[in-house]
Every structure is written in structure tokens, then in C-alpha cells.
UniProtKB/Swiss-Prot annotation:
The family this protein is said to belong to: Belongs to the AspA/AstE family. Succinylglutamate desuccinylase subfamily.
Listed name of the protein: Succinylglutamate desuccinylase
Organism name: Acinetobacter baumannii (strain ACICU)
Residues that, per the record, bind Zn(2+): 53, 56, 148
EC numbers on record: 3.5.1.96
Gene Ontology terms: biological process: arginine catabolic process to glutamate; arginine catabolic process to succinate
Function: Transforms N(2)-succinylglutamate into succinate and glutamate.
Pathway: Amino-acid degradation; L-arginine degradation via AST pathway; L-glutamate and succinate from L-arginine: step 5/5
Zinc among keywords: yes
GO molecular function: hydrolase activity, acting on ester bonds; succinylglutamate desuccinylase activity; zinc ion binding
């Protein structure tokens, strides 16, 4: 098996599309899609995805390195694994996305958009993940880690978002995120069209979207900054004990509301460079627009993913409250 990332960036296929290593078999399922199945019995089926936004390169490089050490025999695979490089079309152009945000296309969201390379890719990703889980052992617990980096700075640099779900959240997933030294966990309060919502909703996978720092071009990442999550991912796929957390207790937030841009004249009371987890207190105005201002009713809230430049009708930010 040649370099997973290089093949994907070049739009090429490996010389052979399947093969066997010392302790697992593998299949190239298509561009940026690699399935690995241990020869021994396994009790977890794990999806690791990166590059759903094409310019978020550090997680892509982490998955590429993971693939390298697995194929070199330096790490023993103990779970059934699907490696996903989400949006090769945007990766090659160094863009977050080319036409529309792929991470808002899942759960059939692509059907409501014009047919583009990216909408077709979302459909392929849904079908590939569905087949992967359906062909895995019926006894295997299902997991999905979707790795991202952010387009803005953050007062809490690394965090995970859990999709809204009615079934209980998985303790092993939470433990792995704590062990990865993430700063915060954020629980969504409504259904969405993200990749992790798709896997959670349709396959009851324990799913999380991880935000792991700042987006930089390929080759400019200091991967030592991602050592904790890299170690945890390797321990998850090799079924080794998780490392001990080195940071203070992880902070926990709940999404309490979404800021929806309803009018063209929409202004947020944040600077363009304001970091994630910027705060507002009771009575302060977060956003103004003719159809009505957003005034804080709680004692304190935090803002995540503020973006006043979204299209009308879309979410311009998340409003969070902290769970004590």
C-alpha cells in the first residue's frame, strides 16, 4: 500500500486495491477511503475521518501517519477501521470547500443542493460508512472520530462537539477525549447535518467532532502540538490503555441556542478576530438585525463559530452555557 495521503492528493489509485498485512487485511474503497480489518476477532468498528474541510491539514496528516505505522507493522490493529479523507476535491485546492460546506450535507442534506463534486462526495461518504458498519461484526461497538482544525483562534484551544442524540453518550468515547487533553466538550441541542450526526443518528455510533487547533497549509503544521490526540487515536485502534490526562478537569458546555442570520443587515458585536468561547453576560446584545436583536438572558454565555458572513437563513454562531 503506497502513501494514503499522496495517492489521494494526486487523484491516483494504488497499484493493488486490496491486500494482507501481518495482522490485518485492507481494501482501497475509493479516493481517500481505506478499510482495514484485523485477522483476529475485534469488538469495535471505528471510523476516523479528516479533511471534510479540505484546508484543515493537520488531522489529515495525523491519519496519514497512522496509516503508515499500521502498514509498517509498528502498531497492531485491534479494531475494524475505516480511514476517510473527506473532501479530496477541496484538499487539492487548499480550500475549506469549493462550492458548499460538506459538513452540512449529511443526513441527506446534499439532496437539497446543486449537484457538485462535493455533494456527490457527501453521498459517497454516507454510502461507504453505511456499508462499513453493516459489514462489521454485529457485536462490535461503533465509533466515529471526525477530526478538524478551526479557522479562528479559541480561548479553549481544543474541544469536541457531540451530536444531539436521544440515546446515552458513550463513556469510553468521553474517556478517550479526556485522555487526549481536550479543553472542553460541547453537547449539541438539536439535530444537524454533520458527518457525526449522520453516524450517530443512523448507526448509533459513539461520535464526536474534534476541533484541534488552527488550520494551516500542508507541511506547515507542528504535529507535536497534536501529540495527545495522536497517542489516543493510536491507543484506540490498537486497544491499548488510554494515557493519563495532563490538563485540569475538562470543561463541559451545552448549546442553548443558535444565532440565525435572518436579514442581510446582520451585525455581531464581536471583532472579526474574536476567538471561539468569547463571552457575553446578561443583558448584552450579541447580534443585531432588523427582525430582532439577540439579547443574553442567562448570567453568562459563550459564543462558538461566530460567522456573520453566512448566507441568510444559516447559523451565524452557537450560544453555549457551561454545565457545572
Amino acid at each position: 500500500m503506497q502513501d494514503f495521503l499522496a495517492l489521494t492528493l494526486q487523484g491516483e489509485q494504488p497499484a493493488t486495491r486490496e491486500g494482507k498485512q501481518a495482522n490485518f487485511s485492507w481494501r482501497w474503497l475509493g479516493e481517500g477511503l481505506l478499510e482495514c480489518t484485523p485477522h483476529a476477532q475485534y469488538d469495535k468498528a471505528v471510523v476516523l475521518s479528516a479533511g471534510v474541510h479540505g484546508n484543515e491539514t493537520a488531522p489529515i496528516e495525523l491519519l496519514s501517519h497512522l496509516c503508515t505505522v499500521l502498514f509498517a507493522g509498528r502498531l497492531k490493529l485491534a479494531v475494524r477501521l475505516l480511514l476517510v479523507l473527506g473532501n479530496p476535491y477541496a484538499m487539492r485546492q487548499g480550500k475549506r470547500y469549493v462550492h458548499d460546506d460538506v459538513n452540512r450535507m449529511f443526513c441527506g442534506g446534499y439532496k437539497n443542493l446543486p449537484v457538485t463534486e462535493e455533494s456527490k462526495r457527501a453521498e459517497v461518504l454516507e454510502q461507504t460508512v453505511a456499508t462499513f458498519f453493516q459489514e462489521s461484526s454485529s457485536q462490535a461497538k461503533r465509533y466515529h472520530y471526525d477530526l478538524h482544525t478551526a479557522i479562528r483562534a479559541s480561548l479553549l484551544p481544543t474541544f469536541a462537539l457531540f451530536p444531539y442524540q436521544t440515546h446515552s453518550y458513550d463513556a469510553d468515547l468521553t474517556a478517550s477525549l479526556e485522555a487526549a487533553d481536550l479543553d472542553a466538550l460541547v453537547y449539541h441541542n438539536a439535530v444537524g447535518k454533520t458527518f457525526t450526526h449522520f453516524t450517530s443518528e443512523n448507526f448509533k455510533a459513539a461520535s464526536a467532532t474534534l476541533e484541534l487547533g488552527k488550520a494551516l497549509p500542508f507541511g506547515q503544521n507542528d504535529l507535536s502540538q497534536f501529540a495527545s490526540i495522536d497517542e489516543v487515536i493510536r491507543n484506540v485502534v490498537s486497544e491499548q490503555a488510554l494515557p493519563v490526562r495532563n490538563k485540569p478537569k475538562i470543561r463541559v458546555f451545552q448549546v442553548s441556542d443558535s444565532l440565525i442570520k435572518r436579514d442581510e443587515e446582520f451585525h455581531m458585536n464581536l471583532s472579526a478576530e474574536a476567538p471561539n468561547f468569547s463571552t457575553f453576560t446578561k443583558g448584552e446584545i450579541i447580534a443585531t438585525q432588523p427582525s430582532g436583536n439577540y439579547v443574553v438572558e442567562q448570567d453568562q454565555v459563550w459564543i462558538l463559530f461566530p460567522n456573520p458572513n453566512v448566507k441568510i437563513g444559516l447559523r451565524a454562531g452557537l450560544v453555549l452555557t457551561e454545565t457545572i
